[in-house]
């Protein structure tokens, strides 16, 4: 009984919630290719290399054809080749490739990719809204108006010399669900946020 209780409490302690819904298991040295290189595409490649477990190689493509242009820069397709031996995530924009990457990983994480589905993926997505915002009510002193979960994420006194790893985790979580904009300050923010120093931050 003592051992059981210890194990349960240890498991609870290990989960701090910071991974949010991005609790992917490690991948299996997945084969991921992208002809084009950019910071955004490197993130997509890294996510798949670290977490893709489907066993089928994945190719990332930025293409400028009629079908993809109709989906916009943030829309994408996820398709399995006719032979079933390759998955292609394609978009007319790099952002669309990243969103498609998270879509594929989400299907995997939620158990929606049995072998039969892997062989016949044919997904096409187009955002209904061009701007998808996460809105904050944070003040420059770290307090949050109507905030009930601690202090602000933003460490203004440390920026720009110290960039917290939490900012990357925050951006990753947003990208994984298609959020492409953020309001980082309260609507009644201090006018200091428009000063040169704060614009630099």
Regions found by a protein language model. Give the residues of each.
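Sec-dependent signal peptide recognition
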Residues: 1-4
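N-terminal signal peptide c-region/cleavage motif recognized by signal peptidases
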Residues: 9-11
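Single, functionally critical "micro-switch" positions that shape active/binding sites
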Residues: 13-14, 92
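Short hydrophobic beta-strand segments
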Residues: 16-42, 57-63, 89
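Feature activates predominantly on carbohydrate-active enzymes
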Residues: 39, 44-47, 71-77, 81-201
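Acidic helix-start/capping segments at beta-turn-to-alpha-helix junctions
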Residues: 56-68, 120-123
């Amino acid at each position: 009984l003592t051992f059981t209780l210890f194990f349960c409490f240890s498991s609870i302690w290990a989960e701090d919630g910071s991974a949010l819904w991005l609790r992917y298991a490690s991948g299996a040295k997945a084969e991921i290719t992208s002809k084009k290189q950019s910071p955004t595409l490197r993130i997509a490649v890294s996510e798949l290399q670290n977490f893709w477990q489907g066993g089928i190689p994945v190719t990332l493509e930025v293409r400028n054809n009629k079908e993809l242009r109709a989906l916009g820069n943030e829309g994408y397709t996820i398709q399995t080749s006719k032979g079933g031996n390759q998955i292609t995530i394609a978009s007319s924009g790099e952002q669309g490739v990243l969103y498609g990457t998270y879509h594929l990983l989400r299907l995997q994480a939620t158990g929606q990719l049995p072998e039969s589905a892997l062989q016949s993926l044919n997904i096409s997505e187009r955002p209904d809204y061009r701007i998808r915002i996460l809105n904050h009510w944070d003040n420059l002193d770290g307090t949050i108006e109507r905030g009930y979960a601690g202090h602000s994420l933003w460490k203004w006194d440390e920026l720009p010399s110290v960039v917290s790893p939490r900012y990357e985790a925050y951006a990753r979580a947003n990208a994984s669900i298609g959020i492409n904009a953020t309001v980082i300050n309260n609507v009644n923010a201090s006018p200091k946020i428009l000063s040169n120093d704060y614009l630099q931050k």
